[in-house]
Design a protein with these regions (language model features):
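Short hydrophobic beta-strand that contains or immediately precedes a catalytic carboxylate
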Residues: 408-409
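C-terminal helical cap and adjacent loop that interface with cofactors, partners, or active-site loops
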Residues: 412
């Protein structure tokens, strides 16, 4: 009897012990994102540039995985950071414009993934930049978001956390210095700098790039401080540390442009000792697998054993169900660039392995079209002045001239994307393949940039994803119309003439953009386009003036004055003023500021008005 009681007691005790252990939460990893603003892989020693001295980042790599192919999706802050925060493609949701003129809403049930972490027991902090282009209650996303935010404030030291730390010492603004500043020596010698082939070799260019290398050193020291804090707290080996740039930059032709210099970012993930079993990679190695910002959220959620919402566009690159071989086999990525500040564009890119395809939907706009903030950098102004003085070689001139409608680059042989192979007969099959991959991608996400921004803002932003699905056939038809620019003009002339007379304003709008892409080749359609200068749709009028003005069939300015004086929205004004700047600066038409009487003059519109009036403040001289 006593023996029975003893055995029963032991069984009960063991049962309680097992119950108590099973009731304890499973230990989960912490996550720290260290983000440097505006820098691509091209400025770090870890990626082969000896002037990018970053010992702290290299120590992360020694204990983690270095990604040779990580991409931001967009080459500018708010769009890239919104992509990072949501794990969704910006043109699919409607937050692809920077600066935003209106906030997009995420689909029902979709939340920023840091909010999902918080709802699953994580302490979430952000120090401090957000720059979101979508509606969000930040108090639901972050326990703390400020320049004082830190994981050290969590109520329970056993509580897992996600902390995002942004550093601005590599930001574009750090290169907005006056000419006199060049008297101050840099730590990096300008004589040691290697300039990209599209840059003129000038003292300003060399000093600017040397100064940027110095900023990277500052970033590295800040990375080291964060890692040391984790060490001091005894949690470094419980924490995945991600270091990356928020997009490329920040010399000219990088930030704001969908070249590798704008999209290809450094990414190093330190693998903690206590959670290395979650990763199918050895510490101190590299991977050639492609990842982008849409993948970061699903990766963190997967490592934290939290399910990923089906609407997210990315896929995990670490954790359960992801092998090193799976990651290594990923070799494709999508990129995009739209209106950034007051400068409009629509560029889409697709990369597969060493091949990069760029589709310029408004190829008649030069890359170097005025953006006031960009041109506060002396190097931009220096470059443009040399172009105007006709002192550049053909490669250096490209930035200020019409682009090709499509571009194809072999990045292995041409890492700076200066030799376009799209017209090379030997690459015709490759071109068709890459063109098809991009087109399929854009159709699969129902790319909302086929709608003018003013139309998208008023009709799509309550739920851009649902709107895209509901209008997928229309988007597909507009995409097909836009792609008539890829065929010989003689083959599409009649179809374009028909579209110019379409009852649908969007078809008239896109037909005119295609005509502008053809330029002089489309001159025979000038008579068909003339009535559209008085179209009932103001944006169609803008595109008619743009096309007819670009071939000098008419003086486009009276039409454009009428549009800007009657436009009711900021978006419509921005589109019209972009066309005015293009026609004045690139084509040579005269602009009279006295003819403009605006109902709205602030923000990006004000920037254009300042520039056209010659009153844009430039503090660099």
């Amino acid at each position: 009897m006593h023996l029975f009681r003893l055995i029963l007691s032991l069984v009960i005790i063991c049962w309680f012990i097992e119950l108590s252990y099973s009731a304890e939460p499973t230990k989960r990893p912490n996550f720290v994102f260290i983000v440097s603003e505006d820098n691509s892989i091209h400025y770090l020693r870890l990626y082969g540039n000896k002037l990018g001295i970053t010992p702290n980042i290299e120590r992360l790599a020694d204990n983690g995985l270095t990604f040779n192919h990580a991409f931001s999706g967009a080459p500018v802050c708010s769009v890239a950071r919104s992509t990072l925060a949501t794990a969704m493609h910006a043109p699919r949701v409607g937050f692809q414009y920077h600066r935003k003129s209106a906030l997009a809403s995420l689909p029902p049930g979709v939340k920023p993934w840091s909010q999902v972490l918080r709802e699953n027991g994580y302490y979430t902090t952000n120090n401090a930049k957000t720059d979101y282009n979508f509606n969000v209650n930040r108090k639901e996303v972050w326990d703390m978001s400020s320049n004082k935010a830190t994981w050290r404030n969590r109520p329970n030291k056993a509580m897992p956390f996600f902390h995002m730390q942004s550093f601005a010492d590599s930001h574009e603004s750090r290169l907005h210095f006056p000419l006199k500043q060049m008297e101050t020596p840099t730590k990096t010698s300008p004589d040691d700098v290697m300039l990209q082939p599209y840059f003129p070799d000038t003292p300003i260019m060399r000093y600017t790039k040397a100064r940027y290398y110095d900023r990277i050193r500052v970033i590295d020291s800040q990375v080291g401080k964060i890692v040391n804090q984790l060490k001091e707290d005894g949690i470094l080996e419980d924490t995945f540390v991600f270091y990356f740039g928020d997009h490329g930059g920040v010399m000219p032709r990088s930030k704001g442009y969908a070249y590798e210099s704008g999209l290809h970012v450094p990414l190093v993930v330190r693998i903690p000792e206590n959670f290395k079993k979650l990763i199918d990679h050895k510490r101190g190695t590299r991977t050639n697998g492609f990842v982008s910002f849409i993948d970061f959220g699903p990766t963190v959620l997967n490592l934290a054993s939290i399910s990923v919402h089906k609407e997210l566009d990315g896929q995990a690159f670490f954790g359960k169900g992801v092998s090193a071989a799976d990651l290594a086999n990923r070799d494709e990525v999508f990129g995009h660039a739209d209106r950034f500040d007051e400068k409009f564009d629509m560029v889409r890119t697709y990369r597969k392995g060493k091949w990069k395809y760029i589709r310029n939907y408004q190829s008649y706009y030069a890359d170097g079209l005025q953006n006031n903030y960009r041109y506060r950098q002396l190097a931009y102004d220096n470059w443009r002045n040399l172009y105007r003085a006709e002192r550049l070689n053909p490669v250096q001139r490209q930035f200020f001239e019409r682009r090709s409608v499509e571009q194809l680059f072999n990045l292995e042989k041409d890492p700076h994307e200066v030799t376009n192979l799209a017209a090379d007969p030997a690459q015709s099959k490759r071109l068709a393949e890459m063109r098809g991959l991009l087109k399929n991608k854009m159709k699969s996400i129902n790319d909302l940039s086929f709608y003018p921004e003013n139309r998208m803002v008023t009709t799509a932003l309550n739920d851009g994803v649902a709107f895209g699905r509901e209008h997928s056939k229309q988007i597909s038809r507009l995409s097909d119309l836009a792609d008539t620019a890829l065929r010989p003009f003689s083959e599409v002339k009649q179809a374009l003439a028909s579209s110019l007379q379409s009852k649908g304003a969007l078809r008239r709008y896109w037909a005119l953009k295609v005509c502008s892409n053809f330029g002089e080749k489309a001159k025979s359609l000038a008579i068909a386009a003339m009535p559209l200068l008085n179209d009932k749709n103001l944006m169609v009028r803008v595109r008619a003036a743009e096309f007819l003005g670009s071939i000098k069939a008419v003086d486009p300015m009276p039409t454009l004055y009428g549009v800007v004086n009657n436009a009711e929205t900021e978006q419509a004004l921005m589109i019209a003023f972009n066309t005015i700047v293009y026609l004045r600066d690139q084509v040579g038409h005269k602009y009279d500021p006295e003819k403009v009487k605006l109902k709205f003059n602030k923000g990006e519109v004000y920037r254009r008005v300042q520039y056209l009036a010659g009153t844009e403040p430039n503090t660099n001289y």
